[in-house]
Amino acid sequence: AAKRQKRAHQTRLLLVVFLAMLLVAGSLAYCEFWLWRPPGEGPAGPKVPRSAFDRPWSTRPVLLVGLGDSITAGFGVSESHGYFGRLAENPKDEWPDMKGICLREVLPKFGTLNLAVSGSTSLEHVEHISKRLEKQDPTVFGIVVMTTGGNDLIHSYGRSPPKEGAMYGATLKTAAPWIEAFEKRLDRMIGMIQDRFPGGCHLFLGDIYDPTDGVGDGEGAGLPPWPDGLKILDRYNGVIHAASSRRPGVSVVPIRAAFLGHGIHCAQFWREHYRSEDPTYWYGTNLEDPNARGYDAIRRLFLIEMVKVKDAM
């Protein structure tokens, strides 16, 4: 009887140890795949062709103008490490593969003007362009970069009923007239920008990224559920992408596609957009804006689109 009791005690002890190990392993796995979002180290984003920066693009005076929201304003990083700053010139600690790849290297008569405002919506961007972007001399060519519309969607994070300019939580039906208004507003903004540059300009318009990596679960980032969120995001991006066909001199920068797999599900290898070559998080702590590596990637995406049209500058 004593031996049976001893064996039973040992069995129970082994079972407790096994269950404890299982619990620890499960907890670690949960943290690994659901909570930990490694930002990674080193350069991020696609390669930019160095050969495109071997000779000047233009001898004209060129003004790089930034418009829109906090992504273009560079929220969360130093001025030199936002995508606008990196477009203009390389920071002192530039990655080796990007040294010498910036606009100042290929535009000898080059200036910058960043009018982007953190937290602003597309409704405010119309006002900013109207009141703050002055008409330029006919000798000046404009390279204009803009991110707009993202704050229209994510504000006010479900803390108040959805409305135009703060649509979080809206149904697609409710948002339909707001999307239509955004299309008209964007067309108006493009027209105003082009009017400000009688000597010509090219607008590079970033589309809107999706921190949920195509899953649509804002609650995974601590936000309320939004069943129609991805549908509305797709409609907004559809408006942005259509802009390049509605007007000449407009290029869309595919930020959303590049950032899929670098959002809140970046560590989950079973997801459709998992990036095995770089399963890291490119967003800041506020979810709205990129982190330093995200800004690096955006800079590269804009430069790639600029290279495609450099001969027209």
Each PLM stretch: what is its role?
Residues A1-L67, I71-P91, R104-V106, T139, ...:
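N-terminal secretory targeting modules
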Residues L63-L67, T72-G74, G111-A116, G142-T147, ...:
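Structural recognition of the beta-strand scaffold that forms the well-ordered cores
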Residues V77-K184:
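Conserved SGNH/GDSL esterase-like catalytic core that processes O-acyl groups on lipids
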Residues A73, H155-P177, D210-D234:
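Serine-dependent acyl-ester chemistry module
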Residues I208-M313:
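Catalytic His-Asp segment of secreted/periplasmic serine-dependent ester chemistry enzymes
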Residues P46-V65, H125-V144, R188-G199, L303:
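Short amphipathic alpha-helices and their capping/turn segments at secondary-structure boundaries
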Residues V126, I179, E183, D187, ...:
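Short, amphipathic alpha-helical "lid/cap" segments that border enzyme active or binding sites
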